[in-house]
C-alpha cells in the first residue's frame, strides 16, 4: 500500500476524504478574508488549498487554483539575471493575467453563469488589459543632439571658344555636431492596472451571486525580487474588487510581499492591512504541549489515507483511527513516530513508510521508528544541509551543545538577536529546527522575548 507524498498526485476525491484540519484551521481557511497561508515544505499547504477548492465548488462558487510554478512559456525567464527586473517583472505579470484569463474562459465555456455574454465581454477586456501592463524600474537614457550644415558656392566665367576665357571657383563647408547625454537612476516601481481592475469587477458582476476564489499556490517559486511586483498587481487590481477572495500558499522565509520605498509608499501587499491575515500551518501543527492532540491528529491522518484502501485489501479492516494504530504499531511506537515527525505530516508519512519496510509483516516497533527516522534524515535533510557550510556548522554546534552537553533537545533564541539568525532560519526551512513556542517572555527581563526551538529528531536519534 502506498500513501501519496504530495497532494497534487492525488485525485479530488482522495484529497477531500483524507484531509485532516488541525484545531480551528479549517474554519479560518474557509473564511472569505484574503489570507496568506504560510508553511514549510511538507506541512500541507497544497493539500489545504486543494481541499478548499473542493469545498468552494460544492457551494456553487467559482474557484481558480493556480500553481505559480507552471505559469509562463519561457523556462527560466523569471530567474534570468541577464534580463532587467523590468523585463522579467512585466513577463511575470502578463503571464499571470493570461493564466487567470484562461481559467475564467474555461469557466465561461463549461459552467452556467448569471450573465454569460457579459462574462465573455469582460474576459475580452481582461485579455486586452493584460497586454498593457508595464513595470518601470531602473532606467538608463541616452539623448543625442546633432546636426549637419553644408554650404557650397560656385563662381564661373566662360566665353566662347576661339578665342575664349574660362574661370571657375568652388567653396564647400560642412559642419557636424553631436552630443550625448546619459542619465542613470532608479525610478519607483509602478504599475498601471486600472483596466485590469475594471475588467475583473465586470467579471465578478457577471458571475452573479457566485463568489470568485483565487487560490495561488507555490508563491515562493517566484524569484524574491519579482514577488513584490506580483503582490502589487493583487493589491491594486484584485483585492479591492468586492466578490473576490484571494488565498496564497507560501513559505514564510522565502517570500517577500512588501517592499517599501523612500517616498513612504510601498510596492506589494502589507500583511494585516491589504491581506486580512497570515496563517501559519507550522503554528497549528505545534503539539509539544498537547501530546494527546498530536497523536489524535496523526492517527486520523493515517486512517484517512489508509482506511479506504485497507477495506479493499483485507477482510476485516480497522474500523477507526484508534484501531488502526493499535493493530499497526506496538505500545510505544506510535507516540515515538509523532515525536519524530515534529508536526510535519510529510515527514510522518515518509518515516512510517520506511518503518513499515523494516518491520515487514510484524507491527512497527520502537526500534523501527528510530531507524526509519535516522534513515529519512540522512536521505532527505542531511544532504541538503551539507551543501550549506554555515548551516552545517551551526547544526553541529547545536547538537553538541544542546543535546550533547545539556542533555536536551530544546533551546531559546532571542527574537531581537541578529547573530546567526539567517542560518537558524535556513535550518528551520530545512525542517532541521522546529518552533515549539513563539514569544516567550523572560520574567526577570520583560523586554526580552524569545522563540523556543527543538532540534529535529533525526539529528540525534541513535
Where are these regions (language model features)?
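P-loop NTPase nucleotide-binding core
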Residues: 40-212, 254, 264-290
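Long, acidic, intrinsically disordered low-complexity segments
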Residues: 23-56, 290-303
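A short acidic (Asp/Glu
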Residues: 48-49, 75-78, 223-229, 256-262, ...
Amino acid at each position: 500500500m502506498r500513501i501519496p507524498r504530495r497532494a497534487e498526485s492525488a485525485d479530488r476525491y482522495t484529497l477531500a476524504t483524507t484531509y485532516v484540519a488541525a484545531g480551528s484551521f479549517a474554519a479560518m481557511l474557509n473564511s472569505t478574508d484574503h489570507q496568506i497561508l504560510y508553511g514549510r515544505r511538507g506541512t500541507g499547504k497544497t493539500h489545504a488549498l486543494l481541499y478548499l477548492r473542493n469545498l468552494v465548488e460544492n457551494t456553487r462558487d467559482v474557484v481558480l487554483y493556480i500553481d505559480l510554478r507552471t505559469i509562463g512559456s519561457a523556462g527560466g525567464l523569471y530567474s534570468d539575471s541577464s534580463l532587467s527586473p523590468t523585463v522579467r517583472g512585466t513577463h511575470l505579470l502578463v503571464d499571470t493575467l493570461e493564466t487567470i484569463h484562461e481559467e475564467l474562459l474555461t469557466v465561461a465555456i463549461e459552467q452556467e453563469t448569471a450573465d454569460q455574454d457579459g462574462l465573455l465581454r469582460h474576459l475580452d477586456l481582461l485579455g486586452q488589459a493584460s497586454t498593457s501592463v508595464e513595470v518601470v524600474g531602473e532606467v538608463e537614457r541616452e539623448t543625442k543632439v546633432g546636426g549637419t550644415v553644408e554650404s557650397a558656392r560656385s563662381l564661373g566665367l566662360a566665353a566662347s571658344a576661339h578665342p575664349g576665357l574660362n574661370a571657375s571657383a568652388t567653396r564647400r563647408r560642412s559642419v557636424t555636431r553631436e552630443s550625448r547625454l546619459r542619465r542613470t537612476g532608479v525610478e519607483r516601481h509602478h504599475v498601471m492596472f486600472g483596466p485590469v481592475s475594471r475588467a475583473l469587477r465586470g467579471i465578478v458582476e457577471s458571475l452573479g451571486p457566485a463568489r470568485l476564489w483565487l487560490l495561488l499556490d507555490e508563491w515562493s517559486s517566484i524569484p524574491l525580487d519579482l514577488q513584490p511586483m506580483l503582490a502589487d498587481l493583487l493589491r491594486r487590481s484584485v483585492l479591492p474588487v468586492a466578490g473576490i477572495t484571494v488565498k496564497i500558499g507560501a513559505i514564510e522565509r522565502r517570500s517577500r510581499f512588501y517592499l517599501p520605498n523612500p517616498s513612504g509608499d510601498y510596492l506589494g501587499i502589507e500583511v494585516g492591512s491589504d491581506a486580512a491575515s497570515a496563517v501559519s500551518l507550522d503554528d497549528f501543527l505545534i503539539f509539544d504541549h498537547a501530546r494527546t492532540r498530536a497523536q489524535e491528529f496523526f492517527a486520523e491522518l493515517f486512517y484517512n489515507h489508509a482506511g479506504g484502501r485497507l477495506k479493499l485489501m483485507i477482510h476485516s479492516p480497522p474500523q477507526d483511527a484508534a484501531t488502526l494504530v493499535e493493530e499497526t504499531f506496538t505500545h510505544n511506537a506510535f507516540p515515538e513516530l509523532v515525536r519524530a515527525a515534529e508536526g510535519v505530516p510529510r515527514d510522518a508519512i515518509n518515516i512510517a513508510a520506511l518503518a513499515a519496510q523494516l518491520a515487514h509483516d510484524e507491527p512497527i516497533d520502537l526500534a523501527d521508528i528510530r531507524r526509519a527516522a535516522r534513515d529519512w534524515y540522512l536521505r532527505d535533510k542531511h544532504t541538503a544541509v551539507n551543501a550549506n557550510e554555515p548551516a552545517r556548522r551551526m547544526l553541529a554546534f547545536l547538537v553538541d551543545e544542546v543535546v550533547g552537553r545539556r542533555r536536551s533537545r530544546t533551546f531559546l533564541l532571542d527574537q531581537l538577536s541578529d547573530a546567526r539568525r539567517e542560518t537558524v532560519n535556513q535550518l528551520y526551512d530545512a525542517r532541521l529546527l522546529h518552533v515549539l513556542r513563539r514569544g516567550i517572555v523572560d520574567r526577570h527581563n520583560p523586554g526580552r522575548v524569545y522563540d523556543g526551538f527543538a532540534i529535529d529528531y533525526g539529528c540525534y536519534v541513535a
